[in-house]
């Protein structure tokens, strides 16, 4: 049976390839999902990474959302940020020479300086994200390293780099939210 996941269809693992049907949403539908604080799956071209990422605008990154991403997505919990916000938080790049295939712009990992325990729980990571996107947060409110992995979006968004990082920031901004 099909499971509806905010405008994207997820198929059971045993679905045969010839039976796969993908339903893609319009940009307007995805922007509406973001504005409403609902998670969506962002997919890229099969000639690029050929993957889908679970995306939620950072303002809505609750403990439950982070827990779902960690359990079901089974990947890193990343935080796409505009470059000026990375600068405000004093986040240097993770490496000085990025040799990854798509040049994903990881900064050093982060943690909220206060209000977290070990940093790894879904609640702690949600708190870290909330602190990082709060307009009143400054560099001294963030500790490094941590358990959230910020990604620095290129200025100019998807018009400059067709990556999930830039798309996540652009969609949030088009939804009237913070670029994160």
How should these model regions be labeled?
Residues 7-180:
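Catalytic domains of riboflavin
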């Amino acid at each position: 049976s099909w499971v509806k996941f905010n405008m994207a269809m997820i198929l059971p693992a045993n679905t045969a390839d010839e039976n796969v049907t993908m339903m893609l949403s319009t940009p307007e539908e995805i922007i509406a999902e973001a504005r409403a604080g609902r998670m969506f799956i962002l997919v890229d071209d099969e000639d690029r990474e050929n993957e889908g990422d679970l995306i939620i605008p950072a303002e809505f990154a609750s403990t439950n959302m982070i827990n779902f991403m960690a359990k079901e997505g089974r990947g890193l919990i990343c935080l796409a940020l505009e470059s000026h916000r990375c600068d405000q938080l004093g986040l240097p790049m993770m490496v000085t020479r990025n040799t990854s295939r798509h040049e994903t712009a990881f900064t050093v990992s982060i943690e909220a300086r206060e209000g977290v325990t070990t940093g790894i729980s879904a609640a702690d990571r949600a708190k870290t994200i909330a602190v990082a996107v709060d307009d009143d947060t400054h560099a001294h409110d963030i500790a490094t390293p941590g358990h959230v992995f910020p990604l620095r979006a290129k200025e100019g968004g998807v018009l400059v780099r067709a990556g999930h990082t830039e798309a996540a920031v652009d969609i949030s901004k088009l939804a009237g939210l913070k670029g994160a």
